Each structure stands twice: as structure tokens, then as C-alpha cells.
């Protein structure tokens, strides 16, 4: 089984072929992050969720040290409860008060993966993927938060998503909802992201992780040439074959944020989701909201292993084309050959030569309409230029 639950220790263990992800439950019911890294053989332990309280701790529970939420490694941190690092979920009630505190309620482990309502998402058969859903509740807001983890064993991928449901009688405002969080001790991590512009996309930007917050985001309604919804943490000296990589990629083409925060206790929090800028969702009584999916990969063999994991995963579990696993038809486009200067005879010559090489379709590009002989006229005049 890819997903195991140890009832006595209150631990969930998610295994791929080469990696392990461990989630633990504190005595108070907080859902905490225990481990993500190379495959573990045998049962993990809960001790990473215990820590000493530093001075000036706003603790409300003298019995357990995990009550200090500003240092607790949360699986899904919420705003307004004493964790002053970046939150993943901010809820405002009908009276205008902001705050949400969720506690473990139940879990379900099942083979396969359910679709995400209204969203693009990965898929797989019951033999290819196994899913853990952890249900948490805020008893004050009557809010249900379901944390979903799908384990694609062969590809060494774990996908995450979140959905919330208002089970109360009053509407709630969702002011922020991210899809994933990863809390870890700092290992001199460097942050890697991708930037660019038109014609020069996906340039690697990598640098030391400073105290405070570093991010990549888009607030213009799309991911783009300039910003890509991908963030990775890498250990120093990481190259294509060596080094540890913790990566997140967002399956969403709208506003997004990928952020890494190094806090005062030298822990690191990486989050990803819908950009909270220009976002607010009115969650009426009985309504649900489904957040998009994040694809997580861990590699102990550098960026090359990470890249191959993503490539294999997207080919097998994201692309729904009937040509996914067979050769695709080939087409040719006349633009680079002719620019605006073409007529019927030129196009037929291109088509005849292309057919000799097995090309099955000719696409006629810019210049066929209006008096479109240069790029400063006739755009939008949908009349054939003969």
C-alpha cells in the first residue's frame, strides 16, 4: 500500500518508489508535517512534532509544547490563531471577524483519485494512484476543511488540493485559500524559480534563502511568459545529478503565488495557491469551494531526477489527448517561410513539398485577411486578402 496509518502513533505515511511523506496528529488535534524525503523503511516517529517553547511564547496549553503554533510544523496553517508565518486559509465571518482554527476530525484512504469539480487536475487508475483525505473542522465557524493527498507511486509524485465547506447557517468570506504548505527545518536552502518574457521564457533564477518572504506570483489573471507557477527549494551545490530538491508546481493558469518564508527559528515554509490579491469568495451556508491542485516532487538526485518525474507524470496523468501514447499527426505552418508575402501558388508549393515528408496539414498564418501586408494594418478585418 502507498498510504499507511499507524493508529497508536497517529501517523500517516505516504510512500512512492523513492520517497516518503509523513503527517502526524498532535494531542490537541493539529495536523502536523513530520517528514518529506528519501524512502523510509519501517515505521516513522512522531517526535518532530515536539519542541521546546522559546521565550515570550503565547502558549495556551501548558501540557503540550506543540501549542506554540508559530513554530509548529503545520500541514495546513490557518490565519488568526497565533501562527504568524504565512497562512494558507483566511476566513472572515458574518460579523467581520477574521480567524480560523481547524482540528483533525476523520480520514479516508482509497484507491484511485476523485476529479476536482470545475478544475483541471491529474488522473489515474486504482492501480496507479492512492488517495488520503484528511477532514478537519473549525467548531466555531462550522467549517469543514478537507486536505487531499494523492500518491502516484511510480512517478514519485504527491498531488495536493483543498476544499472547504460551510456547514453553518451564515455566509463566510474566504479571503485566502492556498493549496499546499511544506514546513521544514532550514538546510541552507536556496530558492529556485523561473522567470522570463516573450521569446525568452523559463530562465532559472536561484539564490540564497534570506530571512523573511521570497515569492513568485501573478496578479494579472494568468500565468505567463513572465511568471511561472513553479518553486523549488534546493540544497547548496545542487546540479542535474546531485543535491536535494523539494518542488511545487501549480495546476492553474490564473492568478497564483508560490512563496518561501524563512522565519526567526530558522524553519522554512513553502506555500502555493491562488494569489490572494483580488481574491474573495462568498461561501454561503451549505456551499463548497474547491482549490486547484499542486504537484509536489522530492528528488535526492538533483534537478534531473525532479524534471524526469514531472515529465513522466504529466505525460501519463495530465494529458488527456488520444495521441498521448501514440504518434501525433504533423502539420506545417507557412509563417516563417513567407511572413505576409504569400498567395495561393506559394501555399500549394509548400503543401506539395510537405506532403512528400508525411506532413498532413497546412496551416495558413497571419496575412490572409484584409490588406494585411505588414503588421500595422488590417488586424481584425476578416475578409480574404487575395
Task: Describe each PLM feature range.
Residues 260-263, 274, 301:
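Conserved mixed alpha/beta catalytic, RNA-binding, or beta-rich assembly cores of soluble enzyme
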Residues 92, 97-105, 281-300:
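Short Pro-Gly-centered flexible turn/kink motifs
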Residues 10-13, 17, 31-261, 277:
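Polysaccharide-binding surfaces and accessory modules of carbohydrate-active proteins
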Residues 152, 293-329:
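Terminal connector regions
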Residues 1-12, 267-284:
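Short acidic, Pro/Gly- and aromatic-enriched capping/linker segments at domain boundaries
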Residues 323-386:
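Aromatic-lined carbohydrate-binding/catalytic grooves of carbohydrate-active enzymes
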Residues 158, 173, 290, 357-358, ...:
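Short loop/turn motifs at secondary-structure junctions
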Amino acid at each position: 500500500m502507498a498510504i499507511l496509518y499507524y493508529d497508536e502513533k497517529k501517523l500517516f505515511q505516504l510512500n512512492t518508489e523513492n520517497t516518503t511523506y509523513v503527517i502526524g496528529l498532535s494531542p490537541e488535534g493539529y495536523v502536523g508535517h513530520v517528514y518529506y524525503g528519501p524512502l523510509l523503511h519501517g515505521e516513522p516517529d512522531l517526535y518532530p512534532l515536539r519542541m521546546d517553547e522559546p521565550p515570550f511564547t503565547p502558549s495556551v496549553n501548558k501540557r503540550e509544547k506543540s501549542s506554540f503554533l508559530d513554530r509548529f510544523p503545520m500541514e495546513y496553517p490557518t490565519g488568526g490563531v497565533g501562527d504568524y508565518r504565512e497562512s494558507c486559509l483566511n476566513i472572515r465571518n458574518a460579523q467581520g471577524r477574521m480567524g480560523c482554527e481547524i482540528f483533525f476530525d476523520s480520514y479516508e484512504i482509497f484507491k484511485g483519485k476523485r476529479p476536482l469539480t470545475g478544475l483541471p487536475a491529474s488522473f489515474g487508475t486504482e492501480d496507479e494512484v492512492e488517495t488520503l483525505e484528511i477532514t478537519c473542522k473549525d467548531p466555531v465557524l462550522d467549517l469543514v476543511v478537507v486536505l487531499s493527498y494523492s500518491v502516484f507511486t511510480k512517478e514519485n509524485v504527491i498531488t495536493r488540493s483543498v476544499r472547504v465547506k460551510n456547514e453553518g447557517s451564515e455566509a463566510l468570506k474566504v479571503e485566502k485559500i492556498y493549496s499546499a504548505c511544506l514546513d521544514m527545518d532550514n538546510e541552507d536552502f536556496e530558492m529556485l524559480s523561473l522567470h522570463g518574457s516573450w521569446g525568452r521564457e523559463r530562465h532559472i533564477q536561484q539564490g540564497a534563502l534570506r530571512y523573511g518572504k521570497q515569492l513568485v506570483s501573478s496578479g494579472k489573471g494568468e500565468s505567463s511568459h513572465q511568471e511561472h507557477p513553479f518553486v523549488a527549494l534546493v540544497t547548496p551545490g545542487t546540479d542535474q545529478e546531485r543535491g536535494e530538491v523539494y518542488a511545487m508546481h501549480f495546476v492553474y493558469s490564473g492568478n497564483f503565488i508560490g512563496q518561501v518564508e524563512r522565519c526567526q527559528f530558522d524553519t522554512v515554509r513553502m506555500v502555493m495557491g491562488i494569489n490572494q490579491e483580488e481574491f474573495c469568495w462568498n461561501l454561503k451556508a451549505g456551499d463548497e469551494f474547491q482549490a486547484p491542485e499542486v504537484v509536489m516532487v522530492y528528488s535526492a538526485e538533483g534537478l534531473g531526477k525532479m524534471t524526469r518525474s514531472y515529465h513522466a507524470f504529466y505525460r501519463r496523468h495530465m494529458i488527456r489527448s488520444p495521441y498521448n501514447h501514440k504518434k501525433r499527426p504533423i502539420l506545417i505552418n507557412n509563417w516563417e517561410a513567407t511572413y505576409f508575402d504569400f498567395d495561393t501558388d506559394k501555399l500549394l508549393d509548400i503543401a506539395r513539398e510537405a506532403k512528400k515528408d508525411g506532413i498532413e496539414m497546412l496551416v495558413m498564418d497571419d496575412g490572409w485577411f484584409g490588406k494585411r501586408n505588414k503588421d500595422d494594418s488590417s488586424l481584425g478585418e476578416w475578409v480574404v486578402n487575395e
